[in-house]
UniProtKB/Swiss-Prot annotation:
UniProt cross-references to SMART domains, sorted A to Z: AAA
Leader sequence residues: none
Family the UniProt entry places it in: Belongs to the RecA family.
Annotated stretches, region: Disordered: 332-352
Entries under PROSITE patterns matching the protein: RECA_1, RECA_2, RECA_3
Name the UniProt record assigns to this protein: Protein RecA
Residues given in the record as ATP binding sites: G65, P66, E67, S68, S69, G70, K71, T72
GO MF assignments: ATP binding; ATP hydrolysis activity; ATP-dependent DNA damage sensor activity; damaged DNA binding; single-stranded DNA binding
Claim: Disulfide bond is one of the keywords in the record: no
C-alpha cells in the first residue's frame, strides 16, 4: 500500500476509534486471544464430535429433537459442567417443567442456579438480554423456543390467528442478543421442538419452531434422537441416543455422537470411555472380556462400567488419553495446514 493510502487509512481508523471507542476496529491478527473457550457437554463422545471439546462461549446454540429425546438432560449436563468450572448459570423455564430433584441428580447445584418462569415470550427474551448485558452470567438456557408465547397471543382469544408473531419476536431478539452475548462472553442455549411441514412430498418434512432467524444466528445446532432402549432384564433403564452436529461454526460439522442416557443419572460416561477406548485401541476386547493395559476390567460392558466406577483413577486416565488423542484446540488445525504449506514451499524451492 502506498504512503498516501496508508495515511488515509490511519486517519480513518483514528477517527473511528475516537467516535466509537478503542477496539471498535482492529486488524484481525492483532487479537492474540483467538482461542475459543468451550464448556464440556458432559459427554466425551459429543465433545469430540463438536471438534472443540464442548460448546463455545459467547455464542448462540440450538438443541432440537422429538419429545423425550434428552434435550433438557443435555442442557442440565452442560450447566453442571459450567458450574464445576466456576461459571454462573441461568435457566429460563418457559415450559414451567423444570424438575429440581432431577437437575440435582445430574450434578447441578440448584442453590447457585438462577431460574425464571416468565409469563410471555417477550418477558423471557428481555430477561435473557438483561442477564447477558449484566456481564455476570456465563450460561443461559431457554427451555423452550416453542413455549415462548407472544403477549398478543396470550391476551387474545383461543381461535385468533397470530401469523408469524413468534418468528418476528425471535428475529428481533436474535439481532439484539448476538452482540450482547459476544461482549459478555455468555453462551445462550435454546431448546427447540420439531414440527411437520404440510404438503412436503420430497425431502425432510421436519422443521423447528420460531422461524428461520435462530437457524442463522446459532453457531452450533444439535439434533438429538432416541435410537433404542437400554434394558436391565425386562426393565427399561435408559435410552440409546444419537446426537448429530447439524451446524458448526467452530469446527467441521455433520459429525455424530452415539451415547447412552441413563434415567436419573444422565450420560453413561463410563460406557462412552469403553466404546471409544475399544475404537481407538486403548481398551482391548477379546470376546466378551474387556481389558486395559493387559489387566481384565470386566466381562461385558455393564461389568466393565462397574469396574470403572469403583476405580475412578483408571477412568480418568483413559479419558485423558482419549482427549489428548482426539481433541486439539480450535485453530491448531489451521496452524498444521500452514506448516504443511510452508514445508511444500520449501521442498519446491529446494528442487529449483
Amino acid at each position: 500500500m502506498d504512503d498516501n493510502k496508508q495515511k488515509a487509512l490511519a486517519a480513518a481508523l483514528g477517527q473511528i476509534e475516537k467516535q466509537f471507542g478503542k477496539g471498535s476496529i482492529m486488524r484481525l491478527g492483532d487479537n492474540k486471544t483467538m482461542d475459543i473457550e468451550t464448556v464440556s457437554t458432559g459427554s466425551l463422545a459429543l465433545d469430540i464430535a463438536l471438534g472443540a471439546g464442548g460448546l463455545p462461549m459467547g455464542r448462540i446454540v440450538e438443541i432440537y429433537g422429538p419429545e423425550s429425546s434428552g434435550k433438557t438432560t443435555l442442557t442440565l449436563e452442560v450447566i453442571a459442567s459450567a458450574q464445576k468450572a466456576g461459571k454462573t448459570c441461568a435457566f429460563i423455564d418457559a415450559e414451567h417443567a423444570l424438575d429440581p430433584i432431577y437437575a440435582q441428580k445430574l450434578g447441578v447445584d440448584i442453590d447457585q442456579l438462577l431460574c425464571s418462569q416468565p409469563d410471555t415470550g417477550e418477558q423471557a427474551l428481555e430477561i435473557v438480554d438483561a442477564l447477558a448485558r449484566s456481564g455476570a452470567v456465563d450460561l443461559i438456557v431457554v427451555d423452550s423456543v416453542a413455549a415462548l408465547t407472544p403477549k398478543a397471543e396470550i391476551e387474545g382469544e383461543m381461535g385468533d390467528s397470530h401469523m408469524g408473531l413468534q418468528a418476528r419476536m425471535l428475529s428481533q431478539a436474535m439481532r439484539k442478543l448476538t452482540g450482547n452475548l459476544k461482549n459478555a462472553n455468555c453462551m445462550c442455549i435454546f431448546i427447540n421442538q420439531i414440527r411437520m411441514k404440510i404438503g412436503v412430498m420430497f425431502g425432510n418434512p421436519e422443521t423447528t419452531t420460531g422461524g428461520n432467524a435462530l437457524k442463522f444466528y446459532a453457531s452450533v445446532r444439535l439434533d438429538i434422537r432416541r435410537t433404542g432402549a437400554i434394558k436391565d432384564g425386562d426393565e427399561v433403564v435408559g435410552n440409546e441416543t444419537r446426537i448429530k452436529v447439524v451446524k458448526n461454526k467452530i469446527a467441521a460439522p455433520f459429525k455424530q455422537a452415539e451415547t447412552q442416557i441413563l434415567y436419573g443419572q444422565g450420560f453413561n460416561r463410563n460406557g462412552e470411555l469403553i466404546d471409544l477406548g475399544v475404537k481407538h485401541k486403548l481398551v482391548e476386547k477379546a470376546g466378551a472380556w474387556y481389558s486395559y493395559k493387559g489387566n481384565k476390567i470386566g466381562q461385558g460392558k455393564a461389568n466393565s462400567c462397574k469396574h470403572l466406577v469403583e476405580n475412578p483413577a483408571i477412568a480418568e486416565e483413559i479419558e485423558k488419553l482419549l482427549r489428548d488423542m482426539l481433541l486439539s484446540p480450535v485453530g491448531e488445525e489451521v496452524e498444521k495446514a500452514d506448516v504443511k504449506k510452508d514445508a511444500k514451499k520449501d521442498a519446491a524451492e529446494a528442487l529449483k
